[in-house]
Amino acid sequence: MLSGVTLWCAIWWVTEPVPVPATSLIPLAFLPILGLLDHKATAHSYGDSLILLLMGGFMLSRAMECTGAHKKVAIAVVQGVARLGGHGGRSVILGFMIATAALSMWISNTATTLMMLPVALAVISGSNDKKFAIPLLLGIAYAANIGGIGTPIGTPPNIIFMGAFDKLGIRDEPYGFLEWMKAGVPIVVLFVPIAWWWLTRGLSGKETFNLPKGEPWTPGQRRVLIMFAVAAGLWI
């Protein structure tokens, strides 16, 4: 019966006869009815602390997307790095990769990539270097995946690992947020430059780029950034 419920959910997730979130509620209704799990244990799984942690990350991601705060952060980082490198192609790509990795540590990899693409495409459209587009787009994709390693909420598999690690009872204390960052952030710091060097090794770096100019921060963007900083501080 459990296999049947699992197969039912899988088929509906793929075919989407109802919204995906609605399909996710099937176990909540049918596991108790079929006697596979009591209703309290089933509901407790939906309210697990790690699920709520992931939900909080998604809410922050949505807030940044709606207000456009992510673009302000990205443009500021890219401009800062590019300024140090004379606005050459290699420095622009490094700026995009650093901004993407930094955002991806707190927002899902896919969402971060989608957020960065419009800014990157605007820069590409003003470039005459045919070799510039591919390293930039691949750099954003790679940096998003690398950045997702930095924090537990960077990507859902991190949360799944934390939950499995705690349930295995390998040690008495749970695997904490800060403890994850101590292991994950050095990996991000190491591999972003390595990926950048590999992707840009064929670029001449002679062309300079005009980056989008940052606009003043709106009150909504400031509030989202403050909430983001408070949430990150409390998580750590």
List each language-model region with its residue ranges:
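Juxtamembrane and boundary regions of transmembrane helices in multi-pass small-molecule transporters
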Residues: 60, 66-69, 86, 128-142, ...
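Hydrophobic transmembrane alpha-helices of multi-pass secondary transporters
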Residues: 5-8, 53, 92, 96, ...
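Hydrophobic transmembrane alpha-helices of multi-pass small-molecule transporters
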Residues: 1-53, 167-170, 179-236
